């Protein structure tokens, strides 16, 4: 069996993201995320204290060749919040930076 290196794992309590297995856990329980939700989660975990613009999220997750509506970011953030937040209407993990984008944490 392949062992996963520590660098392949991000821990931001109560979450653990394992890049080798492409799995995200919350309090040890595996979350059922879509490919896009996983990529967004990974981006936030790689940049825990940085506010990210919608465009940065779009370019990283969808790729620079994506020419759709930037609102797709908001839609997927909302879906992700429903899965990871204790209360999606009052998020504590992914916060909105008004007029800018999103940030991990408050």
Question: Which ranges hold each PLM region?
Answer:
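Single conserved hydrophobic/aromatic residue that forms the stacking wall/gate
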Residues: 1-6, 10
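Short boundary/linker motifs that mark transitions into or out of structured domains
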Residues: 11-23
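Positively charged, aromatic-enriched patches within helix-turn-helix-type DNA-binding elements
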Residues: 21-23, 28-93, 97-100
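Conserved active-site beta-strand element of glycosyltransferases/polysaccharide synthases
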Residues: 102-105
């Amino acid at each position: 069996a392949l062992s996963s290196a520590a660098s392949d794992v991000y821990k931001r309590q109560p979450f653990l993201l394992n890049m080798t297995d492409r799995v995200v856990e919350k309090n040890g329980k595996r979350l059922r995320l879509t490919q896009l939700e996983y990529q967004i989660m990974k981006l936030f975990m790689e940049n825990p204290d940085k506010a990210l613009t919608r465009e940065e999220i779009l370019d990283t997750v969808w790729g620079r060749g994506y020419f759709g509506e930037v609102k797709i970011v908001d839609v997927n953030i909302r879906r992700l919040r429903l899965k990871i937040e204790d209360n999606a209407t009052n998020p504590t993990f992914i916060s909105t930076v008004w007029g800018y984008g999103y940030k991990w944490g408050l």
